[in-house]
């Protein structure tokens, strides 16, 4: 049964109804509409913690979607799933693919930085200072890019950049 027919959650149902209405009135081709339906079902499954189902829907949406911007969001959401399941290598790969398609996607830049920061912390805990500093520097570069695009976001990252001496004054303007 399609996910759209089994949403128990009021917000999910409301989103699904609105998305269906928008799909019907927007002048777009059937392939794009089908891609969006899979993307919507992927988001719903992801919100419910059904990651395998979400990935299946995202894969199908990716197969059908031609628009680079829309593809970037599909890849980004797939990256979120892999990151939450601890597969940081695959998450980074997907976030980078998303940025290749949409370079002004601050949330993907932020998540790349978060992964590098996490890896830096792990390297630091295992006593590898050089590796941890290199990973922290990578995190800093991606956070700076995200902050340049969305200067009012990522306050914790801005504070981390300042306290670790990795910020430059122009990064925030």
From Swiss-Prot:
Query: What is the protein's membrane topology class?
Result: Peripheral membrane protein
UniProt keyword annotation of Transferase present: no
Mind listing the UniProt keywords for this protein, alphabetically?
Answer: Membrane, Photosynthesis, Repeat, Thylakoid, TPR repeat
Task: Report which superkingdom the organism of origin falls in.
Answer: Bacteria
UniProt-listed Pfam families: TPR_1, TPR_7
Task: Give the record's GO biological process terms.
Answer: photosynthesis
Family classification: Belongs to the Ycf3 family.
| Name of the protein described by the UniProt record | Photosystem I assembly protein Ycf3
Instruction: Identify the species of origin.
Output: Picosynechococcus sp. (strain ATCC 27264 / PCC 7002 / PR-6) (Agmenellum quadruplicatum)
